[in-house]
């Protein structure tokens, strides 16, 4: 049975929630589910914006059929070719043989790759600045390459002043019936998943996001319709401000994220001592055991916090496996402008601090705070002083006392 929601007089959400998908893109856990958003414009001409993942195709088809109310779609606008938004394209084309497919030139090539040349031949290519009049509505296409694939388009509806923003401004998490961001406590219930979505899906492409934000600033945008997560119809400055901050790689929170790996608990103990000394100084601290917490959550808070501490034992002459993976993951997302500190452990040859520093060294705008702390097997009184000094250095750096 269909499950749709009206956005305004002419736009209808025809997407679907999915709570059965364990891993988004095969790697990111989504314990609270995810929404695959698609939108239908019913005017003199009808326009379907994107399709959905195969996981929700049955609900999607029922939604589209209901929202069309006996009509057929004149156009399918393809903003993004990733299969979680384009999987149903071929089926829609078979169901509606007279429907015109609109997409970028790069997307047309991808249609031939994901599907076949016959489907690609039905495409009309649109580019930056092209417009489509559907009757009452005039749509303008906006190129948004590498947010986060090269073929991405966005669509601005000049009439209703809304921006269909592809993967930008999205979030992990099912909608649970609440389509609009103002229907939930976004700060409390959604922001962490919006940040985790941004950091892991879009985060590498901060410069490209800045270009899109500049384009949006030149438009009168009163509503944002992303391909995942909530529709924004109020307080757009909130999410636009978050994207501006994240895409400039500026921290949201002055505080410390401590990410640690520990084989037998001794490195964890040292990390806990450091956390206590920081908290005593009034510093906000978040801790993760990187062997337990999936990397996407740690990467997300690396985007959030101003200061990062990495603590790990030496393992087979190198950085402990899960810490090595985390640091490479952070590097692959191109995170910039962070202050960091290191804590290493080793029973006979502690070398982890140097090796972690080497993984961090290529990252832009990263600066080390304090001297690395070395633990030999377990922390003793001699190391307590070094940990105390590191806590003082970090707290002083946050407060500006070290400047």
Residue ranges and their predicted role:
Residues 4-65, 154-157, 161-165, 267:
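Conserved beta-strand hairpin/beta-sheet module of binuclear metal-dependent hydrolase folds
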Residues 49-51, 73-81, 101-104, 163-166, ...:
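Active-site neighborhood of phospho(di)ester-bond hydrolases with catalytic His/Asp-centered motifs
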Residues 88, 293-298:
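Short acidic active-site motifs
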Residues 175, 186-224, 228-231, 273-288, ...:
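FMN-binding flavodoxin-like domain, especially the glycine-rich phosphate-binding loop
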Residues 148-152, 168-203, 247-251:
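Active-site-proximal loop/helix segment associated with metal-binding centers of metalloenzymes
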Residues 44, 55-102:
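Active-site metal-binding motif and surrounding structural segment of the metallo-beta-lactamase
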Residues 45-47, 75, 137, 161-164, ...:
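Structural motif
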